[in-house]
Amino acid sequence: MDPTPQSHPILAYVLSRLPSLLPVSPSLSTPRARDIEQPSPRAPSGAAEFDLVSRMPGLRHPSVLSAMTRAVADVSSARDALRLLGPRPDHELVDSARAFLRSHAAEEAEEEEEDEKVAKSREVVRLDEAHESYGGLLREAEERLDRVYRTAMRGRDMQVVAAAHGGGGEEEAGVVDDEVVRVLRDAEEGKAVERLLLADRQLRHLPEQLGRIRGLLVLDVSRNQLKNVPDAIGGLEHLEELRLASNALVSLPDSIGLLTSLKILDVSGNKLRSLPDSISKCRSLVELDVSYNVLSYLPTGIGQEMARLEKLWVHLNKLRSLPSSVCEMRSLRLLDAHFNQLRGLPAGIGRLAALESLNLSSNFSDMRDLPASFGDLLGLRELDLSNNQIHALPDCFGRLQRLERLRLDQNPLAVPPKEVVAGGVGAVKEYMARRWRDARAEEERRGSAVAESPRVSTPKEWLVRSVSSLGSWVSDVTRYGAGQDKAAAEEEEDAYLQQNL
């Protein structure tokens, strides 16, 4: 919840110098359960602070600090309010709450139990929205402090600037590249334009008119200074390749979901905090690279419609979990999720039957085990699990007989033992295959023992058999009695006839 030196360096520095703005929360002083979506706050980094002061020496000036204090007073009050409300709910819980509210509105349920669930769902959504607003407030405060500092360094009246909360600022006008102008002109004249390569042009702005180039197949604006992508990009209905790597993007427009012909999307090396839910509508995607960003989650339904996706790079982010819909990417051959904060994999990961390369390295103390379905990844050839906290590989690991490359170093492994790991991938495969066979044999032995053991009847079965036996006995008695009556009747009839004669 608190700003960190990595995400908001100036704001974290100012708050660390103001004890009155940092009330101690009881919840932070007591142990709490490990939470995938809400990790424990980390202590400020001294190295990061030293680097910040080296770049901005004026931060030590009392007048600068005083001006900055007034500029961020709203952050303190907002944070206190959020601490009372509680931690932010995880993304999948919020999506579930929103979906329930939509269905409830459509069905107009009136049961008391449903009303209680509606209230809880609304609380989840409101809490998430409050945290989202707080995140925006932190970003605005960081920019505000930067303007206060720059103004102070120019010798202006800092009290006026702080009171205005950073109003004004120098906006940099977007300058359209000559090449873009030429291409737009050609498109207006009816000329076919299929490729637009604008990498390394120091572009800060893309014009809305770009969305009118209907025949465009490839757009490369990598390694520029773009902070946003125009909504009009959704008009490029035939676009197959979009490269936005190494810019300053903090978000992508929802209209990106209209690019249904898109096969390659590269947004690596930006400042993306989230991806739009609409990205799952890019059904033709074959390669998706969202690495080197600050993503803390992926859209809940990202895998539901990406049946053709073959390569997914999500490394060097802050992901704490992968949504279960990732398991629906049945064509996925490569998944790279190293250097995140993953605490596990979805239970259905084994459904990725086409997966050949999987990198889960360097999730450090967060990654501790593998799910039982991991042994279903029979096509896996390359696996990197190094730099984690895995103590034992599951017995089903012995099924991965196609493995050619395996890294397990920097794990506190007990199964397999270190000497086996030192023998390489072949030794590990042989050891785990033997454990798998032994586990299967033991399971079959137990199954046979259960099948051969005398079966204890349940009270219901005993009663059914008793009633059946009683019914048979009554039937026999009835037949016997009927026979006796018939014989007596015949004897009486014979005696009567003889008397008459």
From Swiss-Prot:
Region (Disordered): 25-47, 482-501
Keyword Repeat: yes
Key words, A-Z: Coiled coil, Leucine-rich repeat, Repeat
Top-level taxon of origin: Eukaryota
SUPFAM superfamilies: L domain-like
Organs and tissues of expression: Preferentially expressed in panicles.
Motif stretch (GVYW): 424-436
Pfam families linked to this entry: LRR_14 (PF23598), LRR_8 (PF13855)
Gene Ontology biological process terms in this record: intracellular signal transduction
Family indicated by similarity: Belongs to the SHOC2 family.
Role summary: Leucine-rich repeat protein that likely mediates protein interactions, possibly in the context of signal transduction.
Descriptive protein name: Plant intracellular Ras-group-related LRR protein 2
Provenance organism: Oryza sativa subsp. japonica
